[in-house]
């Protein structure tokens, strides 16, 4: 899709949203067509690094013990230790709250079997299974990447909605993020953006602004 048309849609989305007493998020909505999404190879399951960043921090949880847990704690991340992990396996309500409150999960590799057993049923359907890392990993580069990343997982749905930033970001920054996501969609399919029936940008409390094809 043409960069100018994406930018125009971002600008229009702003005009369609009334000012609120909170900073509204901006989303890209994409409606796919002529794809058999019961076939796994046609589904979109991607982590996309946004060129303009997310504009705000995303909550990250680290499932770890020992030095890795201490490193995560020093970075101000949510830390889930082994004993807490075992408890979460018994308390689905709390597990769901943690899953919904965090955008990404990182897990010490040797704890992954326990993660799968305890949190897998909650994280798996949300597309949030942890990124495994060794016990001596430096978390900083991975955390920095996740702070600029959004995840898409269409499963068998033809429509997906994904965060591209918030209203305090410039139109150009938001448009660049939207374009990066559409480029991933284009590269996924042999016919590229032909499979995009329609696309929109939208603020939290505003109407959707169509991106002209």
From Swiss-Prot:
Name the PANTHER family for this protein. 54S RIBOSOMAL PROTEIN L1, MITOCHONDRIAL (PTHR36427), LARGE RIBOSOMAL SUBUNIT PROTEIN UL1M (PTHR36427:SF3)
**Has keyword Ribosomal protein?**
yes
Which Pfam families does this UniProt record tie to the protein?
Ribosomal_L1
Naturally occurring in which organism (per UniProt): Methanococcus maripaludis (strain C7 / ATCC BAA-1331)
User: RNA-binding: is it a keyword of this entry?
Assistant: yes
- Which keywords label this protein? Repressor, Ribonucleoprotein, Ribosomal protein, RNA-binding, rRNA-binding, Translation regulation, tRNA-binding
An example Gene Ontology molecular-function term: structural constituent of ribosome
The free-text function statement in the UniProt record for this protein reads: Binds directly to 23S rRNA. Probably involved in E site tRNA release. Protein L1 is also a translational repressor protein, it controls the translation of its operon by binding to its mRNA.
State the protein's name.
Answer: Large ribosomal subunit protein uL1
């Amino acid at each position: 899709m043409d960069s100018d048309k994406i930018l125009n849609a971002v600008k229009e989305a702003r005009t369609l949203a009334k000012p609120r007493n909170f900073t509204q998020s901006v989303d890209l909505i994409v409606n796919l067509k002529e794809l058999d999404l019961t076939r796994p190879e046609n589904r979109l399951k991607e982590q996309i690094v946004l060129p303009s960043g997310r504009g705000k921090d995303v909550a990250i949880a680290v499932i770890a013990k020992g030095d890795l847990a201490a490193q995560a704690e020093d970075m101000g991340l949510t830390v889930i230790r082994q004993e807490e992990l075992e408890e979460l396996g018994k308390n689905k309500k709390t597990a769901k709250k943690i899953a919904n409150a965090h955008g990404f999960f990182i897990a010490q590799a040797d704890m992954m079997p326990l993660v799968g057993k305890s949190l897998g049923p909650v994280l798996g359907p949300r597309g949030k299974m942890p990124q495994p890392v060794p016990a001596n990993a430096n978390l900083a580069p991975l955390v920095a990447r996740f702070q600029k990343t959004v995840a898409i997982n269409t499963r068998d749905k033809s429509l997906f909605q994904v965060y591209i930033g918030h209203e305090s970001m410039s139109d150009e920054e938001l448009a660049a993020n939207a374009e990066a996501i559409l480029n991933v969609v284009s590269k996924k399919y042999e016919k590229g953006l032909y499979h995009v029936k329609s696309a929109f940008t939208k603020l939290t409390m505003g109407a959707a602004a169509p991106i002209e094809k």
